[in-house]
Curated annotation (Swiss-Prot):
Family label: Belongs to the RNA methyltransferase RlmH family.
Reaction equations catalysed: pseudouridine(1915) in 23S rRNA + S-adenosyl-L-methionine = N(3)-methylpseudouridine(1915) in 23S rRNA + S-adenosyl-L-homocysteine + H(+)
Predominant localisation class: cytoplasm
Name of the featured protein: Ribosomal RNA large subunit methyltransferase H
Subcellular location: Cytoplasm
Alphabetized GO MF terms: rRNA (pseudouridine-N3-)-methyltransferase activity
InterPro entries linked: Alpha/beta_knot_MTases, RlmH-like, tRNA_m1G_MTases_N
Gene that encodes the chain: rlmH
GO cellular component: cytoplasm
Residues annotated to bind S-adenosyl-L-methionine: L72, G103, L122, S123, A124, L125, T126, L127
Assembly, per entry: Homodimer.
Entry-linked PANTHER family: METHYLTRANSFERASE, RIBOSOMAL RNA LARGE SUBUNIT METHYLTRANSFERASE H
């Protein structure tokens, strides 16, 4: 199974690149984790936000292909670390690759939300999307460490 993070935005601060890459390199070869960046639509005073969301959503869904789609969204289901580890195990048993979608400043398109098999809420707080990349990578790595009895996670 391959994990794929599909995120809107291409120019991240150095600390995001550093943090995300740190966890990316830790994933084992039998569970590769990749980042697919979707260029953010141009937003301005007279921007058609609905159309921008639609276009970003189309690109995200195209990147995900036939993968299981999990959206990152405030109204999603909050998983604690053991629950995320259990989800990771279920995803592995399912056999399909998994695409986790992070929207842009206005969130995810209705099409992305409709295509999602699951929706995961990291927090009831609104989090900056660059930070979410790092949180998701660390959380998934920690979940993997639980499923393999790796010493990274301690009870």
């Amino acid at each position: 199974m391959k994990l794929q993070l599909v995120a809107v935005g291409t120019k991240m601060p150095a600390w995001v690149e550093t943090g995300f890459t740190e966890y990316l390199r830790r994933f084992p070869k039998d569970m590769p984790f990749e980042l697919v960046e979707i260029p953010a639509g141009k937003r301005g005073k007279n921007a058609d936000i609905k159309r921008i969301l639609e276009k970003e959503g189309e690109q995200m869904l195209a990147a995900a292909g036939k993968n299981r789609i999990v959206t990152l969204d405030i109204p999603g289901k909050p998983w604690d670390t053991p629950q995320l580890a259990a989800e990771l195990e279920r995803w592995k048993l399912d056999g399909r690759d998994v695409s986790l979608l992070i929207g842009g400043p206005e969130g995810l398109s209705p099409a992305c939300k409709a295509a999602a098999e699951q929706s995961w809420s990291l927090s009831a707080l609104t989090l900056p999307h660059p930070l979410v990349r790092v949180l998701v990578a660390e959380s998934l790595y920690r979940a993997w460490s639980i499923t393999t009895n790796h010493p990274y996670h301690r009870e």
